[in-house]
């Protein structure tokens, strides 16, 4: 009996360990850009042909574009939420087929959820666009001006609650304190999971509603993966350069995930800003005053999704782009570091960086690097950054070629490119077709 109990306890520990590790060892892939809606034959159909390559890069979750009817073709001005056939990316059937293909490779699918604002179908008696259509034969999501925040005076009739977050000028801000809004959006979010097949969400413009609202939807729908867009600015000095201390920005990100709880994470905009400033001859920025990573990953890496660029910051919008000639330094950093790294479609396929990105992702996977991995920064100078992760992987980015004795003798270089190198501890591992 004693032996049986011990065996059961051992199995429980192993199972718990595997579950915890698998929950942390995530890699997100953004499966679209700002121009994807223009794809001949449909974006969903085109992306389906790249499922194998995406899965081979160690991706565990793919972020897909907003799925519903939208006034703007990219999907970020949604109207008839249940109408997936009106999407510029493809039909509902094509979306479900794409999701099934990803699921067949063990990759989960994340919906881009735009619920802060919504575009109306018709005008009311005042001549204001504030009468909404849900996209079904019944009255689900068929709302009027009373479902709009009262302080959104351009559209509201003044009967709703005040906005719980930041305003969005281009479309009506939805009153998430309204019980019907909460009930019907919860039903729609659950429908995306049960009927369409989505596993998680990316919350667009999550600063537009309170953390209490986000928490309510997360707890009601129980998505397996949640990452929010909390796009905040770096702190800057009077000379226009980023300040050495970026605690204010990363504290805002940490506060959001702590308030929402559960699986909720945020994109680490602090790390993105510091990394793209750092690779331009200021790599010292990547270490804070306590010797830790200077972004959100230095404080709460398990809840930070790191990225180099996305459809807003890069692509054709270029609202805050990473230096184009240094993108692989960015991937060498995020794919070897704590946090959940996000690979951007453009870099993987349009920029022909698939081989380099996949090689870095393979190092992450075979060494078990995950969101909570231990980071030890060895060098953080203007022209060189060197760090060790889990005492198994060492990475160098920057223009400096010689980092002296920073690399121990039992570490062997397995991947290198322009201004970056990665070493692994133990026996020499040389990928097929590569010569060191």
Swiss-Prot record:
Q: Which UniProt keywords apply?
A: Calcium, Carbohydrate metabolism, Glycosidase, Hydrolase, Metal-binding, Signal
Q: What is its EC number?
A: 3.2.1.1
Cofactor binding, per record: Binds 3 Ca(2+) ions per subunit.
The record lists Ca(2+) 2 as bound by 133, 136, 138, 142
Q: Which GO terms describe its molecular function?
A: alpha-amylase activity; calcium ion binding
The catalytic site is made up of 204, 229
Family (UniProt): Belongs to the glycosyl hydrolase 13 family.
Task: Please give the name of this protein.
Answer: Alpha-amylase isozyme 3D
Gene behind this chain? AMY1.3
């Amino acid at each position: 009996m004693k032996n049986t109990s011990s065996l059961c306890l051992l199995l429980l520990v192993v199972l718990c360990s595997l579950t915890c590790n698998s929950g942390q060892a995530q890699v997100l892939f953004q499966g679209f850009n700002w121009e994807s809606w223009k794809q001949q034959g449909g974006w969903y159909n085109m992306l389906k042909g790249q499922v194998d390559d995406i899965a081979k890069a160690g991706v565990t979750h793919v972020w897909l574009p907003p799925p519903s009817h939208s006034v703007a073709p990219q999907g970020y001005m949604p109207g008839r939420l249940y109408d997936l056939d009106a999407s510029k990316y493809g039909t509902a059937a094509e979306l479900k087929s794409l999701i099934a293909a990803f699921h067949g490779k063990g990759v989960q699918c994340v919906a881009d959820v735009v619920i802060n604002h919504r575009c109306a179908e018709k005008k009311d008696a005042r001549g204001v666009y504030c009468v909404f259509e849900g996209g079904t034969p019944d009255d689900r999501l068929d709302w009027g001006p009373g479902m709009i925040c009262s302080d959104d005076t351009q559209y509201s009739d003044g009967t709703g609650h005040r906005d719980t977050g930041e305003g969005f000028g281009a479309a009506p801000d939805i009153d998430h304190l309204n019980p019907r809004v909460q009930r019907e959006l919860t039903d729609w979010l659950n429908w995306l999971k049960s009927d369409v097949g989505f596993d998680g969400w990316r919350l667009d413009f999550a600063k537009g509603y309170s953390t209490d609202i986000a928490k309510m939807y997360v707890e009601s729908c129980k998505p397996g993966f949640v990452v929010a867009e909390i796009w905040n600015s770096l702190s800057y000095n009077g000379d226009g350069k980023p300040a050495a201390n970026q605690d204010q920005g990363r504290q805002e990100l940490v506060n959001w995930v702590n308030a929402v709880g559960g699986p909720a994470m945020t994109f680490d905009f602090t790390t993105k800003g510091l990394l793209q400033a750092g690779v331009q001859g200021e790599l010292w920025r990547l270490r804070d005053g306590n010797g830790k990573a200077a972004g959100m990953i230095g404080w709460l890496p398990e809840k930070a999704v790191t990225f180099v660029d996305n459809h807003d910051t890069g692509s054709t919008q270029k609202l805050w782009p990473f230096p184009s000639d240094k993108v692989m330094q960015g991937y060498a950093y995020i794919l070897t570091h704590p946090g959940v790294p996000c690979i951007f479609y453009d870099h993987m396929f349009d920029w022909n960086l698939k081989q380099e990105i996949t090689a870095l992702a393979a190092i992450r996977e075979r060494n078990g690097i995950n969101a909570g991995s231990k980071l030890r920064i060895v060098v953080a100078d203007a022209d060189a950054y060197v760090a060790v992760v889990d005492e198994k992987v060492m990475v160098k980015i920057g223009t400096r070629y010689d980092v002296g004795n920073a690399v121990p003798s039992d570490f062997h270089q397995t991947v290198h490119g322009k201004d970056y190198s990665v070493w692994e501890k133990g026996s020499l591992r040389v990928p097929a077709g590569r010569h060191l």
